[in-house]
Swiss-Prot record:
Pathway: Nucleotide-sugar biosynthesis; UDP-N-acetyl-alpha-D-glucosamine biosynthesis; UDP-N-acetyl-alpha-D-glucosamine from N-acetyl-alpha-D-glucosamine 1-phosphate: step 1/1. SUPFAM superfamilies: Nucleotide-diphospho-sugar transferases. It is found in: Cytoplasm. It comes from Dictyostelium discoideum. The keyword Transcription regulation does not apply. Belongs to the UDPGP type 1 family. A motif (Substrate binding) lies at residues 105-108, 307-308. GO terms for molecular function: UDP-N-acetylglucosamine diphosphorylase activity. InterPro entries: Nucleotide-diphossugar_trans, UDP-sugar_pyrophosphorylase, UDPGP_fam. Gene3D superfamilies: Spore Coat Polysaccharide Biosynthesis Protein SpsA, Chain A (3.90.550.10). Substrate binds at N226, K412. This is Probable UDP-N-acetylglucosamine pyrophosphorylase. The gene is uap1. Keywords: Cytoplasm, Nucleotidyltransferase, Transferase.
């Protein structure tokens, strides 16, 4: 904890040209002063000023001048079965040794979904009413069972569980920890969890880099983007924890993907087989105009994500000799990193990750009263780092193209509005996937009354273990197939 005299801190802020945030300090209550002081102590004001100057210097540099097609991609449904099995075997072996971890980005609140709780709490409407967090936890639980079955019980999931690193934000940290505690970690080992929070940084004015006060007693702070992960891994001790536990590969995903394939053995095995230190799962663009970032190579031949706003019109529609879009592979924030890569980023490259600017409407304090005001137009910058900005530092990067219908259905928008990426589309997609599990195992589906179908991850992770129960049977929807196998 910072024990520097608060008056010294105040003087430093004044010297750095940020003394205006204290304009209302003398009028605050004792409790407000204490909270304000705590906020101030978390911020390195010199670093804020440095970041602002760097943003100004880098604005032109961030315009991509040259880019090429990224070729190092394998398509999952076109891979030879022998290769897929080889990669799966490698992945399972790495998991059995306790060398694979999962890393969850869980800093988001479900504000666009009409709530203020962490997005991982959300229930999209499955018969079981399971939250996103529970679905993910049960997938890890089932994967550990499959590893144990594969190694005839010799794998000890108590001594070598799949480690789960969960990055929260200031808004979600304590609630997330309490949620898992109250649920007894869904049967997983408490020692397998490592919770840590990403940093909050001040919003600033574009014209002069002044820190914005949300009110007289509170600074306007926002999370530093998913690229803040790498510094948070270092400062929280997560990197040291990974080193101590012998982690070799870390698979990363976002909390809102209801179809996430946790610690996918094929993906990990593919990376290991290719001696890659960085990997990403990608999907084919649904349309040339789909507003997503795509994998590409920069002018130095290094992998990076070409954002939709950066790609020219001709390149959006450009096709190869097979009729496929040249810039076709959309980055969906499902990545994997070798531990050595993460360690190298934390030690050598944190300062090389540049901030990106978002011009936003940011509540600010009335200049006299200090009361919170909501602007009618954008008035400030939020600075964010992006997770994919580490890709150019990779020595070898590979991508695995997956099917959206099996592995990617994000929850972004509220329900009842006929919007994409909503609770309704998530429920539709997971139901369709689970219906395919039943049908591929010889069962039949009667969807005359409903389209909702749920197969518990504790029963089947990817369609395995169902044939003896569902073969030649008809299931009337809605249905939940759980551990009792009697619904």
């Amino acid at each position: 904890m910072d024990t520097t005299n608060f008056e010294d801190i105040r003087n430093e802020w004044i010297e750095q040209g940020q003394g205006h945030v204290f304009n209302w300090f003398d009028k605050l209550s004792n409790e407000e002063k204490l909270n304000f002081e705590n906020d101030i102590r978390k911020i390195n004001v010199k670093e804020v000023n440095k970041d602002y100057k760097n943003v100004l210097l880098n604005k032109d540099e961030q315009k991509i001048m040259k880019y090429e097609h990224f070729e190092n991609v394998m398509t999952l449904n076109k891979i030879k079965e022998q290769d897929k099995k080889k990669w799966e075997d490698i992945g399972y072996e790495l998991i059995s040794k306790g060398e694979v971890a999962v890393l969850l980005l869980a800093g988001g609140q479900a504000t666009r979904l009409g709530t203020t709780f962490p997005k991982g709490f959300y229930d999209v409407g499955l018969p079981s009413k399971k939250s996103l967090f529970q679905l993910q936890a049960e997938r890890i639980y089932r994967l550990q069972q499959l590893v144990s079955e594969r190694y005839n019980g010799s794998y000890d999931q108590d001594s070598k569980p799949i480690q789960w690193y969960i990055m929260t934000s200031e808004a979600t940290h304590s609630e997330t920890i309490k949620f898992f505690e109250n649920k007894n970690y869904f049967g997983l080992k408490k020692s397998a969890f490592f919770f840590f929070s990403q940093a909050m940084i001040p919003c600033i004015t574009p014209e002069d880099g002044k820190i914005i006060s949300e009110s007289g007693s509170k600074l306007s702070l926002s999370p530093n983007g998913n690229g803040g992960l790498f510094k948070a891994l270092s400062t929280s001790g997560a990197i040291d924890d990974m080193r101590k536990k012998g982690i070799k590969y870390v698979t990363q995903y976002c909390v809102d993907n209801i179809l996430i394939n946790m610690a996918d053995p094929v993906f990990v095995g593919y990376m290991h087989d290719q001696s890659a230190d960085c990997g990403a799962k990608v999907v084919s663009k649904s349309d040339p105009k789909e507003p997503v970032g795509v994998m590409a190579l920069n002018g130095d031949g290094k992998p990076f994500v070409l954002e939709y706003s950066e790609i020219d019109e001709q390149s959006k529609f450009k096709k190869d000799q097979n009729g496929q879009l040249v810039f076709n592979y959309a980055h969906i924030c499902i990545n994997a990193f070798s531990f050595d890569f993460l360690d190298r980023i934390a030690k050598n490259h944190l300062d090389h990750l540049k901030y990106h600017v978002a011009f936003k409407k940011i509540p600010s304090a009335h200049p006299i009263s200090g009361e919170r005001q909501s602007p009618s137009s954008p008035n400030g910058w939020k600075l964010e780092k992006f997770i994919f900005d580490v890709f150019p530092f990779s020595k070898k990067m590979v991508c695995l193209e997956i099917e959206r219908s099996k592995e990617f259905s994000p929850l972004k928008n509220c329900g009842g509005m006929n919007l994409p990426d909503s609770p309704e589309t998530c429920l539709r997609d997971i139901s369709n996937l689970h219906k395919s599990f039943i049908e591929n195992s010889g069962g039949k589906i009667d969807s005359s009354n409903s389209t909702i179908c749920e197969v518990s991850p504790l029963v089947s992770l990817n369609g395995e273990n169902l044939k003896n129960f569902v073969n030649d049977k008809t299931f009337i929807l809605p249905i939940e197939i759980n551990q009792n196998l009697n619904n």
